[in-house]
């Protein structure tokens, strides 16, 4: 028999899951939630405990009922038995023969003023009987008033005689009470009661017996029902049909779930609604919810864990120490913008890269390999601009040694500190290159002093950080710097296994018009050959060609060698891992699964709506958005610009990059911008002729930049244009009310004397009385000597009326002002 879950047990026992959990814990069974499974022997223990409790409860209730019944019976026995006494009195009166009454002489009944003696309480009464003081006895029991016999009857109606509760002494001369007739011998019968008179005691006894029978019958039925239920369970348990087993993923839509169970989506939605979940066929449900619903439909559920197929690709297997061979060190050049990183690399490579960069600022990551004393060194040049934080971090992650370039005339700057933090976070040794020492205002010692604050203490001062003074322009200290790099590399004993499938990191990626997607990859282990099938993030492909940093074709790339890879189906993201796989089918499957997984995550993130989100969306309706379609030549630039733009967003204006990509601006980008009311920004790319024509037709703003500073400044200006202008009040003048005049058609006219400034016809005015503003409004008319005027200057008198306001009094101050709108700027 299969194990049951807590919620199933709760449903069968008609209890709450929480109560079942508490009961299980009470008998020593640990369960965590309503989805926990319970062993069969634990379930039997729980059922026994519950049955025991139920039986005890029923027993207590039965005992309680019996006690109540006994108490009721005792109560009835202790009360005066009025019905029986009345019957006896009636029967005694009726059974007495009339002859006895008539045969007795009348004179013997009452002598003179004597009255009949009242019956003694103890005479003529059975033991245990009490006297009834009921004055409303039956009429036959009363003594009648007989004029002929001289018998005194009861007093007239309404005159009740109170009888004393205790017996009194017998009066002399009163006849004894009439004896009760004896029953015939041999018969022990109760006196005959009057025909039609109810026997209350018998009726009560009958009712009591009937009630006891009903209770006994109900108890019998209850026990029978319980026995039948137990028999039914015992019969059903051995032959219970095993539920159908289904396998469900961790996440799926309602429609997919219904299909797995072979049910209609409407049935599943109805069942979800019964649990208070409102869902459409395209909404996702989690595995826990699906398990509960499937169990209700009679299915045994197994949740299939989503296997991350690419985990085995990302985890590197340890290499045999014998297979490791020395590899060139990977050196990252980092530092603040314009401190001479690329110039230093030019001096090392003996080329002129700086001239090719826009504005002399590195916009992309560059990877190069140089040779010194027969040994190779790989250099990675990262941008110093603040927008390229992610690219610097990525450079630090793949590197062995970091060269921190600091200008001797400028000192430590913000990006210098950031570069230090990235290198320390990656656990990379730092070599400080103090550049521009050839300048007259160079202060290398000041740079060293500043860097000690960040834990970089020169070896000459007793620290462990290598400092080299260089001049990229004059090529001073270059040889010494390379020697230090090789020395630090030797200390680290850098090795890799070249005899296995390659694994590397994408440093940069772009879409080349003639060559298609191109990825700059730094091989970290193994050897990458032409013809290898690779998976790179969400993309895959077969390596069509490999190009080194000088643009020459190579057949293979060994560890620590930067190469450009051609042959991918799409442009990968910078930072993606390149892994060689067995065949193209495997590569395609993995890439497609990764794409699907990413798409599901994006859909999941966008489809989840809570009340808090709803309120947020309502509030966001008041926020203005600047939509942007961004295109750049390389992926690193796209990433950097997106990060910089997101930092520009304020509470009032939000920058929203609705689409970003690598490559030229196309018609699709223009159409997207037209549909979403966006502007198109190109960084180092231009629109083609068709896109330009479409932009002119649709009146889409297309802007192209080569330097990131200019791009960010223009976006700030555009955002400032979306801000609501500030309203500023400008006071024009003040005037005092010297006299007021009433006019039937006009209302109250204020005679003013301008104290300061001027009062204009187009201005707004406020009426101030005793320092309190009592009204604000517009000027209806402004006159001087019965002539309409545009304004009245200081020191002059005028007449003024205010729109829809006549409560003007002498001594009031009239203040004229205007509201000016001031253009706001982004702070």
Curated annotation (Swiss-Prot):
Against CDD domains, the record matches this protein to:
IF2_eIF5B, IF2_mtIF2_II, mtIF2_IVc
Q: Where in the cell is it found?
A: Cytoplasm
GO cellular-component term (any) = cytosol
Q: Tell me the segments the record calls region Disordered.
A: 49-205
Q: Which superkingdom is the protein from?
A: Bacteria
Main site of residence? cytoplasm
Residue ranges of region G1? Answer: 335-342
* Keywords noted in UniProt: Cytoplasm, GTP-binding, Initiation factor, Nucleotide-binding, Protein biosynthesis
Record-listed GTP binding positions: 335-342, 381-385, 435-438
| Residue ranges of every copy of the tr-type G domain listed in the record | 326-495
InterPro entries (UniProt xref): EF-G-like_DII, IF2_II, IF2_N, P-loop_NTPase, Small_GTP-bd, T_Tr_GTP-bd_dom, TF_IF2_bacterial-like, TIF_IF2
Q: Which Pfam families match?
A: EF-G_D2 (PF22042), GTP_EFTU (PF00009), IF-2 (PF11987), IF2_N (PF04760)
Asked whether the UniProt record includes Protein biosynthesis among its keywords, one would answer: yes
Q: Where is the composition biased (Basic and acidic residues)?
A: 50-73, 96-106, 116-129, 137-150, 157-168, 182-205
For this protein, the record's HAMAP family field holds: IF_2_B (MF_00100_B)
Entries under NCBIfam families matching the protein: IF-2, small_GTP
Q: What does the function comment of this entry state?
A: One of the essential components for the initiation of protein synthesis. Protects formylmethionyl-tRNA from spontaneous hydrolysis and promotes its binding to the 30S ribosomal subunits. Also involved in the hydrolysis of GTP during the formation of the 70S ribosomal complex.
**Name of protein:** Translation initiation factor IF-2
Q: Which species does this protein come from?
A: Carboxydothermus hydrogenoformans (strain ATCC BAA-161 / DSM 6008 / Z-2901)
